[in-house]
Every structure is written in structure tokens, then in C-alpha cells.
């Protein structure tokens, strides 16, 4: 999931929407996940219906809220410098695949629907480059900017305070996320870094 300070949601006009992904109220407002009435009704029915089913859905919603809070704290903790000497950080990733960085939300029949693929946008606005707005180079799971702990693809842009992740070395391959560890170049670079007596 993206850093809480990064834009992750756009409308069909291509404009950034300022909603907090880690705030349970965002999920409630858009009717996503266990806040989608169809999902909630199905979950309640599968768990006894009535008061028992409603209690189960309430528990799922609290579970989601708890994990969103934990996710926010985890991501924010990465920006806090560790006391003392930190080991050098080396990151590996792919950057040859267009990777989802932002989703488009559109209102369909009174519901807010999140779109992760350009072809799923029901009412695209002419002139909006959805591919450029939604996708960035990555490995189909993690964008290059995210792996580097950056808010932008522009590596010459000065780092903001939220970009405190200090990386000693980065290696990018033309590989999908799920195949990275099987890539011979990945293995070679990792072994070199782990076994080298020289600092990274």
C-alpha cells in the first residue's frame, strides 16, 4: 500500500482526490470491502444471518480498521531514523512493467467504484491519459518510486521529510515481482552483496 502522504486516488477527470487510504471512513464513504452492502449482506448470511451475522460484519469492519491503523504506523515507522549505526539498505526490484500507482474512482448507479484497469472505466473523459495517470514503472506489484521510498519518479527532486528511507544501493531488473528471486541477475547481485567483504 502507498505511503499515507502520497496521492493514490483520482477521479475520471484525472484529478487527485484527497482521501486517506488508511482511514476507515474512506472505505465507509466509498462503500468498499466490508462496507459494500452486497459484501456485508453476503458475509452476514454466511455467518448465521440476523444479529449473529450483523455482529460478524461489525467485527470484520473493526478488523479492517485495526489493520489499516497498523499499516499506517508500519509505513510511517520506515521514515524514522534508527538510533545508532544502521546497516546499509540494498533494494531489488523490477521497473519494466506498468504498475498500478493510483486508482480511478467513478460513480456508477449511486455507488463509488474503484477502477484498477483503464478498460474498466465505464465513462472515460476524452483527453484524459488514464494510463499515464494510473501507472508507473514497476514490477506489477511495487512501483519503482515506492521501492526507492520516493514520492516521485524524478530522482533529482529533493527528498521530503517523509522520504527518509536511506538506500545504499538499488538494483533494477526487467522482471515481474513474483519472479524476482528466481532471476539469475538478482541471485548474482544478492550473493555478491551478502558475501562481499567490501561495504555495499
Short names for language-model regions:
Residues 1-200:
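Helical cap/lid subdomain of alpha/beta-hydrolase-fold lipid enzymes
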